[in-house]
């Protein structure tokens, strides 16, 4: 009987530790985010953001792949859950283009949280919506 109680205790302890580990999500911006941005509801550009918390800063890229754009800075204001993202890219002719996005982080308690706001890329301005995958 004592051995059986010990085995049950060990199983429950292992389950408790594994559930606690799953609950740890880390920084609220960490992950892959996908969505779109554009000046109108019909003129949209697909965008993927990959963001990681390195212990001091949020780093990452826009549209990972051969033409990936490194994020210059990411700022999260936890008092009102606003996000500011800055990056520098090049247009098709090779000229520099500044990208800035400012938005609000919503559905904080959900894994599939969202950021919505304003996207500026060079002279173009529109809204954006991304959801964490």
Regions found by a protein language model. Give the residues of each.
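Central antiparallel beta-sheet cores of small beta-barrel/beta-sandwich binding domains
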Residues: 24-133
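Bacterial N-terminal signal peptides that target proteins for export
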Residues: 1-10
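Bacterial N-terminal signal peptides
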Residues: 9-18
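Sec/Tat signal peptide C-region and signal peptidase I cleavage site
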Residues: 19-23
């Amino acid at each position: 009987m004592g051995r059986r109680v010990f085995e049950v205790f060990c199983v429950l302890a292992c389950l408790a530790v594994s559930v606690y580990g799953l609950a740890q999500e880390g920084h609220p911006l960490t992950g892959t985010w996908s969505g779109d941005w554009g000046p109108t509801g019909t003129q949209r550009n697909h965008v993927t953001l990959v963001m990681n918390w390195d212990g001091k800063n949020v780093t990452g890229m826009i549209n990972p792949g051969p033409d990936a754009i490194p994020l210059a800075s990411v700022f999260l204001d936890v008092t009102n859950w606003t996000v500011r993202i800055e990056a520098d890219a090049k247009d098709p002719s090779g000229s520099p283009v500044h990208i800035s996005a400012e938005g609000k982080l919503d559905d904080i308690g959900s894994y599939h949280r969202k950021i919505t706001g304003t996207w500026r890329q060079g002279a173009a301005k529109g809204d954006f919506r991304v959801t964490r995958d």
